[in-house]
């Protein structure tokens, strides 16, 4: 019996800090079928009884196996609640010799979306760096549940105490490789009644596509800069994928976070 969820996370970040959707929302159907096929082959080859946890990565429709563990994972409680099935109990009984076919494994929450979100302690440690990495930083998990994916995601953010503004000034700072996607994002924010501002390159790129976006200085460009505006509580939403390897870029990124 297979249950597949989709993690939303960058590479080189601990999987325990991920957001997670069940069922997957952006993986192509033929890739899901291939993942199911590969997982069955792995389970049979390894002769696993009970849980088997497999982590896959997908890039350009190519599937990569990251790791295979013959054990449960931290997503079992989330998946059990999402499917309304006692998966840990079933797996334990299978390990003890009972047949999997004995159990009714049909989901009791059909046509529902479940979103798991990680909870971070950054509010209690104001000087800590928000940047995620290989070391797990989250201290808990919450879950959003709804017939609509967007609403399920919103519920998960509210439960994790992540504010969801509905209007105001949105600040955008994007890597060059993200700017094309950022135009569509900017259009959606404007439709939601947000005003836009951004660092020089991002603001110029968005403005070139007919969307009004006010330019704000980076920290290294002098006051008034983005941190001044943030400290003045004038920003409702921050979307930042910027960064870089130079000392100035790293310093700006740390100051913004």
Protein language model annotation of sequence segments:
Residues 28-32, 175, 192-193, 246:
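A generic secondary-structure micro-motif detector
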Residues 132, 136-151, 155-158, 164-201, ...:
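C-terminal accessory/binding modules appended to enzymatic or scaffolding proteins
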Residues 179-257:
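Feature captures the catalytic cores and cofactor-binding loops of soluble hydro-lyases/lyases
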Residues 1-166:
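ATP-dependent carboxylate activation and anion-phosphoryl transfer catalytic cores
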Residues 54-55, 80, 172-175, 245-249:
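Glycine- and other small-residue-rich loops at beta-strand/loop junctions that grip anionic moieties
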């Amino acid at each position: 019996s297979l249950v597949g969820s989709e993690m939303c996370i960058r590479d080189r970040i601990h999987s325990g800090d991920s957001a997670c959707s069940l069922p997957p929302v952006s993986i192509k159907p033929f890739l899901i079928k291939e993942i199911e096929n590969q997982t069955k082959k792995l389970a049979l080859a390894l002769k696993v009884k009970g849980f088997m946890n497999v982590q896959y990565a997908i890039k350009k429709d190519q599937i990569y196996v990251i790791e295979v563990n013959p054990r449960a994972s931290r997503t079992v409680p989330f998946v059990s609640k999402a499917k309304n099935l006692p998966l840990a109990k079933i797996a334990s009984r299978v390990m003890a010799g009972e047949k999997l076919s004995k159990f009714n494994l049909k989901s009791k929450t059909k046509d529902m979306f479940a979103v798991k979100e990680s909870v971070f302690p950054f509010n209690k440690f104001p000087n800590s760096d928000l940047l995620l990495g290989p070391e797990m930083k989250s201290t808990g998990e919450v879950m959003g549940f709804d017939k609509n994916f967007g609403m399920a995601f919103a519920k998960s953010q509210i439960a994790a105490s992540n504010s969801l503004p509905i209007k105001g000034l949105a600040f955008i700072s994007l890597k060059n490789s993200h700017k094309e996607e950022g135009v569509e994002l900017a259009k959606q924010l404007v439709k939601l009644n947000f005003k836009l501002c951004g660092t020089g390159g991002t603001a110029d790129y968005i403005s070139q596509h007919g969307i009004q976006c006010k330019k704000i200085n980076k920290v290294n460009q002098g006051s008034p800069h983005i941190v001044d505006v943030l400290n003045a509580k004038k920003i409702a939403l921050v979307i930042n994928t910027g960064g870089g390897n130079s000392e100035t870029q790293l310093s700006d990124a740390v100051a913004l976070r």
